[in-house]
């Protein structure tokens, strides 16, 4: 025989509020055997039942309404569960004390005061949440600005090298014009990114399509030829002829290759070697590896180098640099749904690995793009 008193409740909350710890704890308790009442709980979405707000004169949500037994009582704010726990023992005693004339019901004045307190508490909570959101947005915009500024360096450097090569007679005027035109187009695209920083999410700036990573890596190697030939560095590639195309943003993938190969050249010893390998490990991903025989990276630094504003370790030749390029690589790869990591040993060298999704006829609804 069930001797529990029936308690009819209505929980008015938005969908996102139902995932808060307070509301989850409240629902779990009401559905458990620990509750001393026979609970009838109705969960209502205010946008679907706006009449509840007027009917119960709710001034804030989430709100828990005790419909029966009478009188009606309302709890609101971010600590509804703890409020309910304070009142449950009093409701339990109501039946025992009713015949003695003891009134344990909240007065109207107390109820109004409590509602105002809850409203102020909720407004403070909203202000804190808005402040956190604004702070995160500013940080995201600053990070994106640093990335775009870093990317601007690449076409500017390439254009400068082309001008120098033309002066030395290594390329003719038509080739110089072609290079300058292509680099100006890249700068124009980057300037568009800058204009969209305040209104666009990082992943929305990507345009994934079917691309050939082998061709992209070959273009980057040629673009950096002056740097690796000057230091007598040999670059070997191991790319299968049947390597599938991938689904990625061509400009961003080129940036990843530029950053990683440029770093490999920068931190390699003179007359050293760099190897670029691509393998089709599964039907979902292509894995790219870029290895050098440079100074290597200490184990303690290997997890940090992909973070913003981290300085790479110094080589024996005194070369050092900021790791924003690796941060850019990490975010680009992650937006495509892939992974990037490093395997390195001090004095032996470093191998940077990253994965890119295979082209499988993806359309806009099947994109791998995620938040970076």
From Swiss-Prot:
Keywords: ATP-binding, Biological rhythms, Kinase, Nucleotide-binding, Phosphoprotein, Transferase, Two-component regulatory system. The keyword Cell inner membrane does not apply. Residues 147-360 form the Histidine kinase domain. Its EC number is 2.7.13.3. It catalyses: ATP + protein L-histidine = ADP + protein N-phospho-L-histidine. SUPFAM superfamilies: ATPase domain of HSP90 chaperone/DNA topoisomerase II/histidine kinase, Homodimeric domain of signal transducing histidine kinase, Thioredoxin-like. Pfam families: HATPase_c, HisKA, KaiB. One of its GO terms (molecular function) is phosphorelay sensor kinase activity. Disulfide bonds: none annotated. InterPro entries: HATPase_C_sf, His_kinase_dom, HisK_dim/P_dom, HisK_dim/P_sf, KaiB_domain, Kinase_SasA, Light-responsive_reg, Sig_transdc_His_kin-like_C. It is an enzyme of class 2 (transferase). The modification Phosphohistidine is found at residue 150. GO terms for biological process: circadian rhythm; osmosensory signaling via phosphorelay pathway. Member of the two-component regulatory system SasA/RpaA involved in genome-wide circadian gene expression. One of several clock output pathways. Participates in the Kai clock protein complex, the main circadian regulator in cyanobacteria, via its interaction with KaiC. KaiC enhances the autophosphorylation activity of SasA, which then transfers its phosphate group to RpaA to activate it. In addition to its output function, recruits fold-shifted KaiB (KaiB(fs)) to KaiC to cooperatively form the KaiB(6):KaiC(6) complex (independent of SasA kinase activity). The N-terminus interacts with KaiC, while the C-terminal histidine kinase domain autophosphorylates and is probably responsible for self-oligomerization. The N-terminal domain stimulates the C-terminus to autophosphorylate. Homooligomerizes. Interacts with KaiC. Participates in the KaiBC complex, whose core is composed of a KaiC homohexamer and 6 KaiB. This is Adaptive-response sensory kinase SasA. It comes from Prochlorococcus marinus (strain MIT 9301). The lineage of its organism: Bacteria, Bacillati, Cyanobacteriota, Cyanophyceae, Synechococcales. The gene is sasA.
